[in-house]
Amino acid sequence: MAILSAAFFDYPQDDLFVIAYTGTKGKTTASYFTEAILNEARPRHIALFSTIDTVVGPEPDQRFKSNLTTPESLDLFRDMREAVENGMTHLVMEVSSQAYLRNRVFGLTYDVGFFLNITPDHIGPNEHPTFANYLHNKLQLLVNARKVVINAETEHFDQVYAAATTTTYPESIYLFASAGFRPKRDDIDIDFRFDSQEADVAESRFTLVPVTEKAAALNIGGHYSLA
């Protein structure tokens, strides 16, 4: 159904820069943060498919409550096409393990895929039969992303990183971790470090530092890009 839906709506994903998040926890929060950041840079051009809201255009009536974290295939590609027709250039979306288990996003490639974390959850008669099945379906996002960003502190990191390397070159895989984290293996580098500065009920402050050369580089020529 996913392949047919993509073809029926004339492959709308090709007209969008697609950023996808997966993880047991944090997908919705991260998606909303990303949407907000992108909207500062490119107002009224950012679509969102999240557990809470679906945004397919800049007008109030083009924002509505979601039924699923990741829509069924027909709804997904229809909403993508509508977003394109409404002038959206970027899409931030949550991708659940159920979306892969049910083949809702089969064949969809993401420009950037984020893997936040994995813990035993969503395992049962109506979800995943085993944790191995749950992890396998989570990892499919990495296999289908052009660039990958991984939380280096996640459980089962070795399996997560190995999945990313099956289809993505190392220079397109980025790792992030807290300031004090030290990886257990010496063949990887942490690209971004973050450090919490202050947190209260009103706001949180933190620093994010690019550590490696590739993390500090922009694929855009010109000194003006650094301003």
Question: What are the residue ranges of the model-derived segments?
Answer:
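Phosphate-binding loop of NTP-binding sites
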Residues: 3-170
